[in-house]
Amino acid sequence: MDKNELVQKAKLAEQAERYDDMAACMKSVTEQGAELSNEERNLLSVAYKNVVGARRSSWRVVSSIEQKTEGAEKKQQMAREYREKIETELRDICNDVLSLLEKFLIPNASQAESKVFYLKMKGDYYRYLAEVAAGDDKKGIVDQSQQAYQEAFEISKKEMQPTHPIRLGLALNFSVFYYEILNSPEKACSLAKTAFDEAIAELDTLSEESYKDSTLIMQLLRDNLTLWTSDTQGDEAEAGEGGEN
């Protein structure tokens, strides 16, 4: 199937909410080796975000059930085995994306904007792996996530306006990484607050086409700050990551 057909099929799959099909189409487009257009890049990102998001959500539910069934050995074993099955799926998806990023997407990125987008994506998918990692593996995975976010963050500060939705989305997710994965609420708050304040100070640089995206992410940054600085330290913190682009 040629590239245009694959892209059309991915759009059709998106409308049908068949994200596994959508991801498979965009994976094939990526493997053809050409740099992706903005539209193709967004289709790839949306597809995998939904595919991995379904597993992350299932994993949380089953993990919670597993913890609640302590003492009921049979039930707990069933929940544990099911959680492990979901984890395997989740890892396979993340490794698929990380392989596309390493082989094609990051090396082919010719603009700072694409480079930041893909490095942020690398940080995100290592973060999803870190959520389910345990033991010796975990530290290496967390380091990979942090390095990708940090590299993206440095490029974005040099090359992009503080109001750019990709720069803001990166700050949002990097701050969630500090809060959730590194358990560093101070660092998470400082990063989110700086990103929010810098964007507010330059609101006049907001371009018309990204106005909606940028203001939505600014709202999420502010919501997270409110949540993180209040005493309620619950896992709702993750909610702040839901509206990134």
Swiss-Prot record:
**Mutagenesis or variant effect for S145L:** Found in a patient with a neurodevelopmental disorder; uncertain significance
User: Matching CDD domains, A to Z?
Assistant: 14-3-3_beta_zeta (cd10022)
The protein's name: 14-3-3 protein zeta/delta
Listed A to Z, the keywords are: Acetylation, Cytoplasm, Host-virus interaction, Phosphoprotein
What are the recorded GO MF terms, alphabetically?
A: cadherin binding; DNA-binding transcription factor binding; identical protein binding; phosphoserine residue binding; protein domain specific binding; protein kinase binding; protein phosphatase binding; protein sequestering activity
PTM statement from Swiss-Prot or TrEMBL: The delta, brain-specific form differs from the zeta form in being phosphorylated. Phosphorylation on Ser-184 by MAPK8; promotes dissociation of BAX and translocation of BAX to mitochondria. Phosphorylation on Thr-232; inhibits binding of RAF1. Phosphorylated on Ser-58 by PKA and protein kinase C delta type catalytic subunit in a sphingosine-dependent fashion. Phosphorylation on Ser-58 by PKA; disrupts homodimerization and heterodimerization with YHAE and TP53.
Query: Upper lineage ranks?
Result: Eukaryota, Metazoa, Chordata, Craniata, Vertebrata
Q: Which residues form a coiled coil?
A: none
Instruction: Mention any one GO cellular component term assigned to this protein in its UniProt record.
Output: cytosol
List N6-acetyllysine occurrences by residue: K3, K68
Result, substituting S230W: Found in a patient with a neurodevelopmental disorder; uncertain significance; gain-of-function mutation in signal transduction; changed regulation of ERK1 and ERK2 cascade; increased interaction with BRAF; increased interaction with RAF1; loss of phosphorylation by CK1 at Thr-232
Quote any Pfam family the record assigns: 14-3-3
Site note Interaction with phosphoserine on interacting protein applies to R56, R127
What positions are modified (N-acetylmethionine)?
M1
